[in-house]
Amino acid sequence: MKQPLILGLLLSIALPLFAQKKAFTYSFYGQVRGDLYVESRASQEIVDGLFYLYPKDHAYDADGNDLNAAASGNFYLLYSRLGLDVKGPNIGSAQSSLKLEVDFRGSGSNWATLRIRHAYVNLDWGKHALLAGQTWHPLFGDVFPQMLNLSTGAPFQPFNRSPLVRYRFQPQGWQLTAAAVWQLQYLSNGPNGKSEEYIKNSCVPEFYLGIDRKGDGWQVGAGVDVLSLTPRKQTTIDGQIFKVSERVTGVTGEL
């Protein structure tokens, strides 16, 4: 009697799963991207020049020659990428979906290795949506310059994808966004250099709240972001270690 009972249980699980497969649709996308660049002057940059920030100031040698007045260039395919979009079944009255996207940027100076760009699940109720996973930081809004270069307006436009939980309310013509944000690839700087330990030790995520008004061909909005970090838990004075309690909190506004 045990075998038919087990078989019945397996069928009761398998049949709903088989039925749910029909509710899933997916599509792959991607690109092979080559970036060839030539700079007439030394610049502040990351990814060995692929992500341009701004030109460096004069730096003179003993003869008065500007050391930064030198050209450079290279060719990379690190930002070739592959992505998957999945539209899932309704969960209650919410439409479920997920996105997974990778490129070959790597992290730090470890280039040409796989890196997660986007990885999230989204539940959409129409006017309400809840997203959990990694995607664009809320400060990277819908308004940004269209350009061939990867920097998309950096350092003034924050180019950042982070793990977050985001809620959006979208009545007609309006968009209200609230998010709790953590750090993974884009890290705060502190006593030990760039590290995720400062926000981890803080035990408090970064918070964002913003509102946008959209019309035909125009958009205006405002937002505020609060980041509170614990830069260290201990310090050393005269060879002795002491426990410390520190917190650094910053507020950023956008318009």
Positions of predicted regions on the chain:
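Sec-dependent N-terminal signal peptides
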Residues: 4-13
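Sec/Tat signal peptide C-region and signal peptidase I cleavage site
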Residues: 15-19
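Outer membrane beta-barrel
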Residues: 21-48, 59-60, 64-186, 203-204, ...
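Solvent-exposed, glycine/polar-rich loop segments of beta-barrel outer-membrane systems
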Residues: 46-55, 235-241
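Extracellular loop and loop/strand-boundary signature of outer-membrane beta-barrel proteins
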Residues: 67-70, 105, 148-153, 189-197, ...
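A short secondary-structure junction signal
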Residues: 143-144, 179, 187-192, 223, ...
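Detector for outer-membrane/organellar transmembrane beta-barrel domains
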Residues: 216-255
